[in-house]
Amino acid sequence: MSELILQNNNYLKGRLVIFIGLMLNALTLVSCNKINNMFKGNNTKFHWTPTVAAPRNYPVETGYAVFIYGDKKVGYPVMETRFARGIGNPLSAEDFDAPGSVYELPKRIRVLWLSITEQKYYKADIEIPAEVQDSMLHLFQKGFYYPIDKTSEEYNTIVLTLLPGGKMWLTVAGAGKRTLVCDNLKATETHVDFKDFNKEAYECFSTMQKYCAAALGDYDGVKENLEEVGIPFDLWDVYKERFNYTIKIDFENNKTELDSAYTSYEFTNTDFLYDGDKSPLTMKARPFHIGFIWLVDHYKYTGEFYFDEEEVINVFREAFNQKHRKEKGVLHIHISKYNNRFDLSLNVGKDEYKLKHTNIYVFKKRIGSTSTKEEVFYDNCRDVDIDELNFLGF
């Protein structure tokens, strides 16, 4: 029996024993980002679900993906096998456990996957570095503040993002926040008998290469993107770069009120949080999307700002060059008196770098209106579908 089949059977059996026992209550790392948080509570077991993610333009199929936890090294398998919903995306998580079931956080990851665009297999059987385990424990123990509901929330999903070239990221997620905890895990290219990897696909296509070519058609635009752009293996190294900057939003009309509870930031390294979060980021990756609400003259305005990938990469690279890498910057969004002009810039030291190609949507609604509809007040990208605003490697 092949190693692939043994891996699947052993881990699924181990997991099944836990399900029954609880009566359904339930590489080498070069550098990983460490999250510094204070402990609150001493829990070491939590209700969590593992999942896998991959870029929309670079889908993967897993032979197995197992998160190993506990002294008995029990495996928690990811049941879904196809992934292309986006980096750090937790939506593929399938939680079959009862709400009260809790487990220790994972210590090891075993994964085998087929990179469909590369037509290559990658494999990893690696210990999660101790500092990353500590970071996850701190985050799960502390949870996070969700300013919209003014509630304390919990992390409940651990996302393994599989990238071209065998790179892997670990992100922890909850309803209202995502935090990248490790960005430098690495798998190695390997050889697998395609018949063992996917027997049904083997019977239909006979070879992995034919299967991958056909599978590209399952994803909108992926084949065309591959032909036009190829695979930018170093792009995700750019995405994970962090800089010391703050985000400032202000208005020409000083009577305008920013509803900070709804101000959200999404970054290129999968980090996502609200401005009212009580554990704000000091070092941030480049922004991908910023959304916020402001109130003025009896109207509520909702703004969605999607940054241009090429521009935001180049501007941050130039502003935080080797000479200014350690300086603190300010990403400034200024809104005009009539809410229809938007000046965006990155300011580092005495230098200002304009961001002129940001895609902006603004919706308007009268405060107190019972209508569920919002008027499109401003749109500088009318001919662009919102799905097209995703970055290449997202």
Predicted regions and their residues:
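N-terminal secretory signal peptides that target proteins for export/translocation
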Residues: M1-K13
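Short beta-strand elements
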Residues: A124-S135, Q141-Y146, E304-R317
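Compositionally biased low-complexity segments at domain edges in trafficked proteins
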Residues: M136-D234, A319-L389, G393
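An N-terminus-focused feature that recognizes amino-terminal "leader" regions
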Residues: N37-I68, A93
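Contiguous beta-strand segments within globular domains
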Residues: F39-A54, E228-I249
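Sec-dependent signal peptide recognition
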Residues: R15-N25
